[in-house]
């Protein structure tokens, strides 16, 4: 996930303030290599055995590894909110939008409604704006913005309206999303 983060992090020096996510990822890979840790990406663990041996599928091949310790880092998965129409083409998660923009240089769409005002929703909304997308609104069921004020302020300064205490009722369209209905929550 760090390799998709083109923005600079903030906070304390120990939390990698003022360093871009992809640079943090590169540094962590170098640290792991220097410590003798073998990092295997895009792999699937097929079996784990009592003697600390694992079998791993990498591409079309099965590999065996044995070590003193096994660390399982499963990665992250998006937590999609489901609603009628959520499977229509054009309804995507923030991570997919970020991958399209930051890794492939592709605009995820022209007019975007962002669901979620946590740091991910705020940062990705700002990245969408920088990419040339129109973020038409930011919607969150919570009564307050969930992310850091600095991220919310950047988005707000662009004129994006925030609909707090609201959620998506349905995505509209037949073969792709053409609109969204939102409603206030209790």
Name each model feature, range by range.
Residues 78, 119-121, 145, 169-170:
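Glycine-rich nucleotide phosphate-binding loop and flanking beta-alpha elements
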Residues 1-19, 78-90, 146-160:
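Conserved N-terminal glycine-rich FAD pyrophosphate-binding loop of Rossmann-like flavoproteins
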Residues 4-11, 15-16, 53-57, 62, ...:
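Extended interaction regions within the primary functional domain
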Residues 1, 89, 98-143:
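Rossmann-like NAD(P)H-binding beta-loop-alpha module
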Residues 18-21, 67, 98-102, 110, ...:
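Short, surface-exposed, polar/charged, turn-prone segments marking secondary-structure boundaries
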Residues 24-111, 185-186:
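FAD-binding core/adjacent interface of flavoenzyme oxidoreductases
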Residues 27-56, 129-186:
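A Rossmann-like FAD-binding core segment of flavoenzymes
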Residues 26, 95, 122-123, 149:
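Residue-level marker for well-ordered alpha-helical positions
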